A protein has these predicted regions:
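Intrinsically disordered, low-complexity segments
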Residues: 2-4, 22-25, 243
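Bacterial N-terminal signal peptides that target proteins for export
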Residues: 2-14
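Subset of outer-membrane beta-barrel
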Residues: 28-349
C-alpha cells in the first residue's frame, strides 16, 4: 500500500474514532472506580509515557498485555521489568516477556507469546476500632498473571487470545481468585500503518466472602470488572522520525444486582481517548509524550486528564543483546504527586 493510501486510511480511521466519541459524549456518567483498576493503569514506562495508546503499536518495543495479538510482531525477545513510584503507600510493578516464534517447518507467518505479571497494593493502612484505638497496620494487594498467544494468519494479519488469572487480598482471610479472557487482532495496513482492536476482561470479577471473619453474619459480595473495547491506529512518521498512536477505549459497565434496599445502580458506559507519540532524535534516544483519559462526557473534563512524558535510552552490547532504560512521568488526578515509572528493557535475538 502506498504512503498516500495509508494516510487516507489513517484519516478515515481517526474520523471513525471521533464519531464514536461524539456519540458517547451524550452520556452523563463519569469514569468510576471499577474493580481491577490497577490492571488498567498501564504497563511499563513506554506505555505510560505515550498515554497507553498501545493497542495497535507494532513498530516500537511491544508489550503484548495491551493486545494479545501484538506479540506476533515482536521479532526480538523483549523482557520488561518496571517499578512505579506512587503516593499514598501504593505500589505497582510489572514483569513481562514478549516474543514472536516460527512454528516448526513454517516458512511464513508465525506465532507470538506474552508472559506477564502485574502486582499492585497498598501498605501501612491504619486500622482502628469503633473507639478509634489503633488495632494495627493492614495491607491489601492485587495480582494479574497473564498468558497471551498470537497467530499470524498472513504477514499482515494476526489474531490473539489472552488468559488472565487475578488473585487479590482485601483483608486477612478475605481473598478472591478470578479467571478472564482477552481477545485481540492486528492488521498491518502498510509498512507505516497498523490498526488494532482488543476486547478485554471477559468474565473478570472479584468475589469476597467474609464468613471466615464474621461467621454466620458474613456474606458474599461480587465486584465485576468492566468489559473494555480498545480500538487504535499507529503510524510511523516519514524518515522513521517517530511513531504517532491514537486509541479509543470503551468501558462497558458490568450488570449490577440490587442492593439491600432493592435499588439497582444505574448502568452506564464511558469512552476515553488516548494519544501518544515517540520521537527518535538519534537511534539510541527517544522522547515520548502522551495524554490519557480524555473523557468528553465527564463533568470535570480537565480533572480526569493524565498528561505524560518520558524518555528512552538503549545500548547494543552485541548483535544479539540490547539493554534499555525507560522513564515516564504522568500527572494523576486527585493527587499532588505524579506517577513515575522506571522500566528496564532487555532485548535479545
Amino acid at each position: 500500500m502506498k504512503t498516500s493510501e495509508s494516510k487516507i486510511l489513517l484519516k478515515r480511521f481517526i474520523a471513525v474514532i471521533l464519531f464514536v466519541i461524539c456519540i458517547s459524549a451524550t452520556s452523563q456518567a463519569q469514569l468510576g472506580s471499577y474493580a481491577g483498576s490497577f490492571s488498567r493503569m498501564g504497563f511499563g514506562a513506554r506505555g505510560l509515557s505515550m498515554g497507553n495508546a498501545m493497542v495497535s503499536d507494532i513498530f516500537g518495543n511491544i508489550n503484548g498485555i495491551y493486545n494479545p495479538a501484538l506479540s506476533a510482531f515482536q521479532i526480538d525477545g523483549n523482557v520488561n521489568l518496571g517499578y512505579t513510584f506512587l503516593s499514598l503507600d501504593r505500589k505497582l510493578n510489572f514483569l513481562g516477556f514478549t516474543k514472536k516464534f516460527k512454528l516448526p517447518k513454517q516458512q511464513q507467518g508465525g506465532a507470538g507469546i506474552t508472559l506477564a505479571w502485574v502486582n499492585a497494593g497498598v501498605s501501612d493502612i491504619d486500622g482502628r476500632d469503633n473507639d478509634t484505638r489503633q488495632i494495627g497496620l493492614f495491607s491489601t494487594f492485587e495480582n494479574e498473571f497473564y498468558l497471551g498467544t498470537a497467530f499470524l494468519l498472513n504477514e499482515n494479519l494476526a489474531l490473539g487470545v489472552g488468559f488472565k488469572l487475578y488473585y487479590a487480598k482485601l483483608f486477612e482471610e478475605v481473598t478472591s481468585t478470578s479467571f478472564a479472557i482477552d481477545l485481540g487482532a492486528i492488521y498491518k495496513a502498510s509498512k507505516n500503518l497498523s490498526l488494532g482492536i482488543a476486547i478485554k476482561d471477559f468474565g473478570a470479577k472479584y468475589e469476597w466472602k467474609t464468613s471466615e471473619i464474621y461467621g454466620s453474619l458474613g456474606n458474599t459480595t461480587v465486584d465485576k470488572f468492566p468489559r473494555i473495547l480498545d480500538l487504535g491506529a499507529s503510524y510511523v512518521l516519514p524518515k522513521n522520525f517517530g511513531i504517532v498512536s491514537i486509541a479509543v477505549q470503551q468501558y462497558f459497565s458490568p450488570d449490577y444486582e440490587a442492593d439491600s434496599t432493592g435499588v439497582v445502580p444505574e448502568k452506564s458506559n464511558n469512552t476515553v481517548l488516548r494519544l501518544g507519540t515517540e520521537i527518535s532524535i538519534v537511534p539510541q534516544v527517544k522522547f515520548r509524550v502522551g495524554l490519557d483519559r480524555i473523557d468528553f462526557s465527564a463533568d470535570d473534563f480537565a480533572g480526569n486528564l493524565r498528561p505524560s512524558f518520558g524518555i528512552g535510552l538503549d545500548k547494543s552490547f552485541s548483535k544479539t543483546i540490547n539493554l534499555g532504560i525507560d522513564y515516564s512521568f504522568q500527572l494523576e488526578p486527585f493527587s499532588h504527586d505524579a506517577i513515575q515509572n522506571i522500566t528496564v528493557a532487555f532485548k535479545f535475538k
